Each structure stands twice: as structure tokens, then as C-alpha cells.
Regions:
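Alpha-helical transmembrane segments in inner-membrane proteins
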Residues: 2-359
């Protein structure tokens, strides 16, 4: 009798989890679509929502052309839509990479910056700005930032290896050291830079989607797609890793290879996002942490949910950055920090209150 009740309870629990996951995904997807449409319509030049939808219909050949809407169409397709889509890609990349890092390190407070990817990207961007490099035209700074992110991540991984494997603690400590050196290089570059370059560096480090183009979207989406697919494929293995390294190895998981591929995928995602949007804090920390509290630890559910949640938060932050102050385009990093900082504090206090803090 007890076994029957236990089995029934387990079925009810799984059904409850599935319902919660379904509701969460539905909410995130609908909210993201609504915010994307609002973000496309709102700004210094407001475009009614029905005209935004009609413009998409005209582009798809589902609605007749309207000569009186040429200005609105030009604004939407040359400025608003590229920015909105780039923001969605950046948010999805940061949210997913944060969830992967928290799984790899077994710490819900981990984020992509732990492995030095953000600081490496900042060094690359600062070099291109200070030296006024123009090898790839408008893509020079993003290219240098992306290469810097990958280089810093590779440096952290290989320096932390010992006896053929990289331990979690070694990677964290090596990441701290590499980040410190990167910050020193950034400070030196800002010291020798002229006023214009210094202002560009400061604005880039705050994070912004200003100046987004279809070329930027076209160049970044394949990289982010590859990173997302790699992370989603690894989700089941990351769930096994949560049981512990020894248990994962006994289950047939190559822990060292899983960790290396996870870090490489995270470097791709974060490097691509930071290259075009600058450093945007807290997305990779707060979104996975909140969704884990709602959905549980299963990465098969958590990773795609983190992608949607990250995209939603970036879209909301960019909307606020463009509309809260008239005739100004504020850095996105201001809004993510304003949301992420207090949220992080609340989560930390809740964790300590439940006995999760170190004594």
C-alpha cells in the first residue's frame, strides 16, 4: 500500500513539474513576443503596434504596400528590428551560458565571467579602440573582442590543468588571476588613450545595442546558434554531472571532455554576445538562478528556459534604455545592474536564511 502511494506521489510530482514547466515556457515565450513588438514600436519616433504588425505583413507579402508608411517601414527595418533581434540573441546567449557555468561549477552563483571571458573581450575591444584599428571596418572592435574572449578562456582552462585535468577550484582561481591581469591592461590602455577613445571604452563596457545592423545580426547568429545547440545537446550529461564527478564517470560520462566542451560553448556564446553588446552584467547569474528555483535543476528544461528568460530581460532593458530618458540611449548595463543587484542580494539573503551560507 505504501509503495502504491509512493508511486502515485511520484507521478503527481512529475505531472506538477511538467505543468509548471509548460506554464513557464508559455509565459516567457508570450512575454518575449509582446516585448519585441513593443520595443519595435516604441522609441523617439513611436510607431503604433498595428503598424508594426502591418509592416511585417507587407514585407512577407501578406499585406498591400502603403506609400504613406515609408518612414515607419524604414525605421523598423533599418533600425528597430535589427536591434531587437540582436538583443534577443545576446540575451539568449548570456542566459544559457550562465546556466551551463552554474552546472559545470556546481554553484548557482557562478556566471560566465568566472572563466575570464568578459575581461578578455574587454581587452580585445580596448586594444582595437585605443590603437584605432580598422582591419575589418565596423566589425573590427567586435572581432577583437571575440578573439580576446576566446583567448582568455583558453588561457584560464590550460593554466588550470594539472595531471591532464582541470579542477573546478583551479579554474576559478585562475579565472580570478586572469581577470585581474586583464583589468590592469584595460586600466593602462585607458590611461594612454585620448579622450574620445576613453569615452568609447567606458560606453562599450557599460553595454549597449546602439548601432545594431542586419550585418551584425547575420554575423553573430550562426555562432550563437552553434553554442546554443551544443549546450542543449549536453543538457542530459550536465544533469548526470550534478550527481558528482565520480557518479558521472561511473555512468559513462567523460567528465573532463564534458567540462572542456561546456567551457568552449560558453566562451562562444558569451564572446559573441559581449563582442557586439559590450559587458552586460547579471544576465548569466540572475536568470538561471531564478528559473532553477521555479523549474528545478534539470538542465533539459533549465537551459532553453534560461535562453528565453535572458532574451526577455535584455529586450526589456533595451526598451527602457531607449525610452525612459527622452532623446537619449542609455547603456543596457545600467538596467541589468539595477535589476540584478537587488535581486542577487535577495537571493543571497534567502539562501543564508535557509542555511545555505558558509559558516
Amino acid at each position: 500500500m505504501a509503495a502504491v502511494k509512493s508511486a502515485a506521489g511520484a507521478r503527481d510530482y512529475r505531472a506538477s513539474r511538467r505543468r509548471r514547466a509548460g506554464l513557464t515556457f508559455t509565459f516567457l515565450a508570450v512575454a518575449l513576443c509582446v516585448v519585441m513588438v513593443l520595443s519595435a514600436g516604441l522609441g523617439q519616433y513611436n510607431i503604433p503596434i498595428n503598424q508594426v504588425v502591418a509592416s511585417v505583413g507587407r514585407r512577407l507579402g501578406l499585406a498591400p504596400e502603403n506609400p504613406t508608411m515609408q518612414l515607419a517601414d524604414s525605421t523598423l527595418w533599418n533600425i528597430r528590428f535589427p536591434r531587437v533581434l540582436l538583443g534577443v540573441l545576446v540575451g539568449a546567449a548570456l542566459g544559457t551560458s550562465g546556466a551551463v557555468m552554474q552546472s559545470v561549477f556546481g554553484n548557482p552563483l557562478a556566471e560566465p565571467g568566472v572563466i575570464g571571458v568578459s575581461s578578455g573581450a574587454a581587452v580585445g575591444a580596448c586594444l582595437s579602440i585605443v590603437l584605432n584599428l580598422q582591419f575589418f571596418g565596423i566589425f573590427t572592435t567586435p572581432a577583437f573582442a571575440f578573439v580576446g574572449a576566446l583567448a582568455a578562456t583558453a588561457l584560464v582552462y590550460f593554466l588550470s590543468r594539472s595531471s591532464g585535468r582541470a579542477k573546478v577550484l583551479s579554474m576559478i582561481l585562475t579565472g580570478i588571476a586572469v581577470t585581474a591581469v586583464a583589468n590592469a591592461i584595460i586600466a593602462f590602455l585607458m590611461f594612454i588613450a585620448d579622450t574620445t577613445s576613453r569615452d568609447q571604452i567606458v560606453f562599450w563596457q557599460m553595454g549597449s545595442l546602439n548601432g545594431s545592423t542586419w550585418k551584425a545580426v547575420a554575423s553573430v547568429w550562426p555562432v550563437i546558434l552553434i553554442g546554443l545547440v551544443a549546450c542543449f545537446v549536453m543538457a542530459s550529461s550536465l544533469d548526470v554531472l550534478a550527481l558528482g564527478e565520480r557518479a558521472a564517470q561511473h555512468s559513462g560520462v567523460n567528465v573532463e571532455r564534458l567540462r572542456a566542451v561546456s567551457i568552449a560553448a560558453t566562451a562562444l556564446l558569451t564572446g559573441a554576445a559581449v563582442a557586439y553588446a559590450g559587458i552586460i552584467a547579471f544576465i548569466g547569474l540572475i536568470i538561471p538562478h531564478l528559473l532553477r528555483m521555479i523549474l528545478g535543476p534539470s538542465n533539459r528544461v533549465l537551459l532553453p528556459a534560461s535562453a528565453l528568460g535572458g532574451a526577455l530581460l535584455i529586450a526589456l532593458s533595451d526598451l527602457g534604455a531607449r525610452t525612459l530618458v527622452p532623446f537619449a540611449d542609455l547603456p543596457i548595463g545600467i538596467f541589468t545592474a539595477l535589476v540584478g543587484g537587488p535581486t542577487f542580494f535577495v537571493l543571497l539573503r534567502r539562501s543564508l536564511g535557509q542555511g545555505g551560507g558558509a559558516s
